[in-house]
Amino acid sequence: MALSLSFIICHLSFSVACTSNDEDDIFDLPASQRLAATIDHARQVLRSAEYGWEFEYYPSATLAYGGVVYTVKFDSLTANVGCSLIADSTETSYYRLTNDNGPVLTFDTYNSLLHYFSTPNSDEYEAKGGEFEFVIDSIADDLITLYGKKTRNTMYLRRLTAAPSEYAKKTISIFDHFVDSIRGTIGTAAIEGKCNPTRRSINIVSGRDTFDVHYTYTDQGIRLYRPLRIGGTSVQTFSLDTLSNTLTCTDQGAGNVTLQGIPYASNVMSYPRYEADYAMIYGTNDTAYVHLKPNRLEGTYIMQGLSPKYDLVLRYDAESSDLKLGAQVIGTYNGNQVYWSTVNYRNGSISNIQIADEGQFTLHWNGNRFYPRLNFTATDPKESNLVNSGLLIYLYHDAEGNLTAGLLSDDEWLTNGSFLFDNLKSLNRKGRLEE
């Protein structure tokens, strides 16, 4: 049974494709009652899924972040949401089905997973182009088509056939085993493609033609945002064989398309390889023991262990395969923002204090699998921007209203009893690096 909504003019004009006598009766109702019946039907279908739905979500009108699959289980008032790229992640929040010139699904109470791309911060006042209101375009038992009210991006709810935790486990495995590049033939066209795993995009070249395609990871492989037609053949959905590194198209009419994935070279630090325990070496003879934990949703790493009060965020650079560490807000102290700032520290003197995240440090692997080390270097070596250390500061307004920086000396925030990480040298990995 399928119920399709096609918006022809504004307000309440739409057509309904029906497959039962009960649905035929809808045409005999006033427009407001027809819409109410449609919303009621949508609610019934949403709640009917035993395991919930995989929500194929694309933030940003430019598709700058590719897509992300959330898992969503609906009851009468709330939705239990998980992210397929974050293990054991679930949050429950309220949702609504409303009328705004047609049926709209709204997640209108805060959910840190689902609202990640739509929540602004000090560096992104417009957030990441995400949204939480979705116009329902069509409804079938196993597939609901929506589009973002703001971006107009097409999105899908697909009925899950297994528990969300199992779906996430398989999807994370696909992410961690994904390839550096692809090559092969689609239809009559030879193609090569370079993958960006954390931005979920592939730059495909075929002869003189170039295609930038965006995708979501699934529990089987990847699904492109829209079908790619090349060499007379359309492809969209692929399964990944992690042993042979092959991507096989599962779309009807394209089952003979198999692309060869090229794994990362052994001398390249792909995103998943950074996860480990490390000893941070700095100062004259100082060591702090930390753990790098992946955040696959962001394509970043979380450095844990410096203090119970904060963690640091490191960005993965897909082009260089390095990590970038910049100045960043890490919390509040007595109502004032606290920064892990980057500075230049020489002979007891501090200069070049920076509080904006510009990836001031590059962490580059030394190339040794048996004694792996990530060396700190200044990303910008110019003297005016040179940094070599980290410093805990907080910003406050003095008696005259001037914005002033103070050194944070509260013991709970300190590492090895100090607010200064002078002359950062390296992160020395615990254990060897597997191929």
Residues covered by each model-derived region:
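Beta-sheet ligand-binding and adhesion/scaffold domains
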Residues: 23-24, 110-177, 187-189, 220-272, ...
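Bacterial N-terminal signal peptides that target proteins for export
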Residues: 1-5
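Extracytoplasmic/periplasmic C-terminal soluble domains
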Residues: 158, 165-214
